Design a protein with these regions (language model features):
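Extracellular hydrolytic enzyme modules, especially secreted metalloproteases
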Residues: 271-273, 277-371
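Bacterial N-terminal signal peptides that target proteins for export
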Residues: 1-9
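N-terminal secretory/membrane targeting signals
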Residues: 10-14
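Zymogen propeptides/activation segments of proteases
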Residues: 21-304
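N-terminal signal peptide c-region/cleavage motif recognized by signal peptidases
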Residues: 16-19
């Protein structure tokens, strides 16, 4: 389901088309535990195409596959304009990178590698039809949320009331997704969120998958031999997880047939969000918040196809699991593009903090003329 608004056209011309999108994060605090038990406090920055760990001075940190330690990174040039980010011997949090000759801040992948990562999310042409654009941009849109955890995890402990407040709070001072879109649309659109499996009082109830978290993380010969090794394997594992989650809900806690989940009557679920327990990891992988399309299989809720979806991580903290992020992702569903600059080798950020589609603030800021 997409919103057709003429001013979207200009913004769409400013970015490359892609089937996946999300809001970027910058300097989000994370903790990593070294093999010897030491705690490493660092940061993560990036988006679903590419993200990296770094310290407070922006020295990139990677995991050494030989011993599992988080270390400072260097680059190795492979050919003109291309390079690889590689681990060094210098353990992050132990040495001062400023004193090590050859270590430099701001290291990341080269432009071509980034573009290759972006293309991995494109929907292959001819494989599946895309949801048609209806032009409907007002009325009641019912957002479906499905909670997910892995076989080696206990239930989500975030109180349901906290999550519901970010989505549905309608009080006068609320900054929820519902209140945001009601305000910016001048009361033309009401977005209500419904949760499955149905919560038990103030306790979240989630679908528990048959496989552990490590199955959905990258393969590592030392630290994760259970992980995926190719991009196709990653996609199949993610899509299969989401398919099982939908099928579980259909069988055990079904969406009522009276709930209109296809506001524009195009045959597709308007918006579905999978909230997965846990937080993001440091390098690009499956478990990072993103929007994609379930293009390689047909999954249905009450006869409506599940196609475009959002994936959010419940444990990613107030910086990312927030109404601001939900509003950014919902704007994608309504047709808005990302306005932040994906990759140019600089910190230039387009319209910057003036538009929710470029950067996220708390509370979420309004859109600009480009959205």
């Amino acid at each position: 389901m997409k919103m057709t608004i003429k001013r979207f056209v200009l913004a769409a011309l400013l970015m490359a088309a892609s089937a996946v999108s999300a809001s970027p994060v910058f300097n989000m605090p994370v903790v990593r535990i070294q093999p010897n038990g030491d705690t490493l406090h660092c940061f993560v920055s990036g988006d679903e195409f590419y993200h990296r760990l770094h310290d407070a001075d922006d020295y990139t940190i990677v995991q050494n596959p030989r011993n599992g330690y988080w270390v400072y990174a260097d680059t190795v040039h492979t050919r003109a304009g291309r390079w690889q980010v590689v681990p060094t011997q210098y353990v992050a949090g132990v040495v001062n990178p400023h004193t090590i000759a050859g270590l430099h801040p701001h290291l990341g992948v080269d432009r071509e590698t980034w573009l290759e990562k972006q293309k991995l999310f494109d929907v292959p042409k001819g494989n599946v039809e895309s949801p048609k654009t209806s032009g409907v941009n007002h009325g009641n849109l019912n957002n479906v949320v499905i909670f997910v955890r892995f076989s080696d995890e206990t239930e989500i402990t975030t109180p349901f009331s906290n999550i519901n407040a970010m989505f549905n709070d309608s009080s006068a001072t609320s900054t929820s997704m519902y209140s945001y879109f009601k305000k910016v649309s001048y009361n033309k659109i009401n977005i209500l969120t419904h949760y499955y499996p149905t919560p038990s009082g103030n306790t979240v109830v989630s679908y528990q998958d048959s496989l552990p978290r490590s199955y959905y993380q990258p393969y590592d010969s030392t630290t994760n031999t259970n992980g995926y090794q190719t991009d196709d394997e990653r996609r199949v594992r993610e899509f299969s997880l989401l398919e099982r989650a939908v099928n579980y809900v259909n069988a055990n806690s079904p969406v009522p047939s009276t709930l209109n989940i296809d506001m524009d009557n195009d045959g597709y679920v308007d918006n579905i969000c999978f909230v997965v327990k846990g937080t993001y990891t440091g390098w690009s992988d499956l478990l990072w918040p993103h929007k994609w399309s379930l293009w390689d299989r047909q999954v249905y809720i009450n006869g409506k196809r599940v196609y475009t979806f959002n994936l959010q991580l419940e444990g990613s903290g107030d910086h990312y699991f927030s109404s601001s992020t939900f509003c950014h992702e919902m704007f994608h569903t309504l047709g808005a593009p990302d306005l932040y600059r994906y990759y140019v080798g600089t910190n230039v950020s387009g319209v910057g903090s003036w538009d929710l589609m470029c950067s996220n603030t708390t509370p979420p800021q309004h859109m600009s003329a480009y959205t």
